[in-house]
């Protein structure tokens, strides 16, 4: 069993987000899912991003860091889209992580103020033509780090793992989950 700390995307903790977390739990993993939005959820990505913007992206990120303060170090930090900000920050700055799962994009490590940790395994999952997912940043991270695997999926949907999102792609989501579970087995 691996402990996964999963940060939600800009739509908040939607039913599809919870369903994804439950699939990890059903495979035997412990999942902690901090709520960065204090219960708010959205069905439209632009509205969710507007909420994050009005709250302040730094505030949203800090909520994630604060939520992780009392959690153990030997976890897998996972973030979906907006949730990448706290997940990737913690993976890069908090020693002891087992790995990182960067779903629906990634952030250039230098934008978070520190390099990618040597030897830290990670997976990046994004659709090839995702306008929100910064595919070039994902490619650059994987090219620069031997421990980072990049998985590109056909299509343009952003939140394709969220069954309650208009972007949901069941086949891509199932393949992603298969790869994530293999990763968790390997690093656990």
Language model segments and positions:
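Short beta-strand/loop motif that positions the catalytic acidic residue
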Residues: 124-126, 153
